[in-house]
Amino acid sequence: GKMLLGESYETEYDTQEYVRELKESGVVCAVNMDGYFGQELKKMQKKQEGFEEMFFNFMQLDFSAYDEPDFCNRTETVIEESYRQGCRGIKLWKDLSLWKRDKYGKPIRTDDPRFDIIYDTAAKLHIPVLMHIADPAAFFTPKSERNERWEELDVCPEWDFSDRETYMSFEELMQMQENTVRSHPNTTFVIPHVG
């Protein structure tokens, strides 16, 4: 989809060929985390046309109106409409807690009460929320030869989240994740990259 392959993803691969390769590899179905919502979701579904049994789409949400009074109502509407269009989960990307900011320049937190509408609506619809909060803990410590990932950080400096003026600490992010999960016992959460 668009998030990982860019605007021209529709021409990047042949869906029929891709599905054939998946089936040859023993894949019964695939979960697409890049479903978006609205017109972008329709575009994705057109790309998957004829192979709907092969893909489960997870929706993404629009956080540009996070500080607006109608954020909760708009978000609930998007979730319900995307569900009616066939989405079977919600994907919260790590950019939410790492790069997105509120109107005061503070990081957006997944345990903010304004997000309750996301988790409560997911529970009501019996769909999971896949919440990608952070990257490896080493990316949140200064780059040095003592950092187990220093070579990766040398090659990809944009993965360095050690600046506490800009990013929450890894521990803060994990506590935020724990707060979110604990306060929504009826919601199914998928926490990726555990290990």
What annotation goes with each model-predicted range?
Residues E17-E21, V78, R114, I118, ...:
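Alpha-helical packing segments of well-folded alpha/beta enzyme cores
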Residues Q39-T166:
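Active-site gating/metal-coordination segments in enzymes
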Residues G1-G50:
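An N-terminally biased module of ancient metal coordination in phosphate/nucleic-acid-related enzymes
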Residues E24-V28, F51, Q85-G86, I118-I127, ...:
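A structural motif corresponding to the C-terminal end of an alpha-helix
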Residues G1, V31-D34, F58-Q60, K91, ...:
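Active-site neighborhood of phospho(di)ester-bond hydrolases with catalytic His/Asp-centered motifs
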Residues G1-L5, L130-A134, I191:
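Histidine-centered catalytic micro-motifs
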Residues G6-S8, E12-Y13, E171-N179, S183-G195:
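H/E-rich (His + Asp/Glu) clusters that bind or coordinate divalent metals
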Residues L5-Y9, E158-E171:
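A short acidic, glycine-rich active-site loop
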